[in-house]
Structure formats: C-alpha cells, structure tokens
C-alpha cells in the first residue's frame, strides 16, 4: 500500500502530529500509533502514515482527511489529542500539531501526486513565519522546488504544504534511497542557491530525514497483543494492587 498526496487538492486536509518519545523501546510507541491510525478511520481519516526520524528523536503521525470547517478541525484536534493522551501519554510527548494543505509539487513520472510507502525515505524542511509573510514564503519555497527538482539526483517527488491555522510551511521530498539523500546534503551548496529566495524572511529552517515505518493498509499484526511498555506499566499496577491487598 502507498499514501498518495495530490499536489493541489482543495478538498483534502493534512494533519501532522509530532512526538518526542520518552521510552527506550521506540517500536512500542510505533505499535500504539498503528492502532491509533486504525481508530482514526472511524473519524473519517482516509489515509495515515508514521514517519520515524533516522538521526533525531522524533516521530510524526500523518493523517489525510476530507476538507472540514475550522470549527470541525478544532473539534477533531481535541478528540485526537484526547485519544493520544489515553493511549501514549506514558510513551511520548506531543510537541507540535497542525493542519496543512498541499499547494504544489513536482514528480519524476509527471504525475500530480506524491506517493510513499513503508520503507521509503523522506526529507522534511519546515519553517514558521508571520501570517503576513506566509503566502510569500510558500511561493518562494515552491519556486525553489520547481527550479531545483530536476537537478537533484535520486528524488522521486517533492511536495509543498501550507499551514492552515498556523503560519508555517513544510516541504517534503521522497527519495529513491537514503544514499541519494545523503549525497545531496553533503555535495550541494544549498544555502548559496536558496538565499536569494529566502533572505527577506526572518525564519529558521528546520530539516530532518525520516523513514516511513507504516502506511494505512499495512497489516497490523497482533492487534490484541500487549506491548513491552504496557507489560511494564501493568506490572507496576499489579504490584501496587498487591501491596494494597497486603495492607
């Protein structure tokens, strides 16, 4: 299965929930987020995915939804945060979340969608700006993507997202392999050709590389199994109950 994101589809909302794990066994957190993905289908989520940072300590949950009003998104966000608190609050800290919309992109095969599957490599650039500068920043980043995409070896597609409730921009590249991604980072003078587009903006561009560890449609094995972290928590609870009974 693959997630397919149209370059410019006005009836689709994209959500990003960013987590910083607080446990050692990150696979347990991924396991719980897979189950969370299944439950979001009942709320209308049409596709979801999990990105795991290759070098940093970060997990991103991606969800695509039919376009909703601002009030509906606020209610949905509140519901999702409550669900996440109940399921993973002892495993990770929710550090950021936002709804975005795709507004442009490029692909090697000429299609108007970006596709990624489990195992694929993604790179994400993001920046927060002011509300007044958001449109200008977004189109500057799109201009960079369109002018450089064909020259970047190993890219499959590139996609730009614009924040809806927060003034932010996210640019995503899908790569053929981690090797191509590293080669581009190490061998290109990105600052030199990006600055003419971005020097007027007061921003801090953040960058990270992720591996896709799940997309909706993948088999989630052992749905009823208990993760290592859950067993530890259950063991603590049983111990406390035993002490109460002894007292």
Protein language model annotation of sequence segments:
Residues 1-172, 176-247:
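Short S/T/G/P-rich N-terminal loop/turn motif that feeds into the first structured element of a domain
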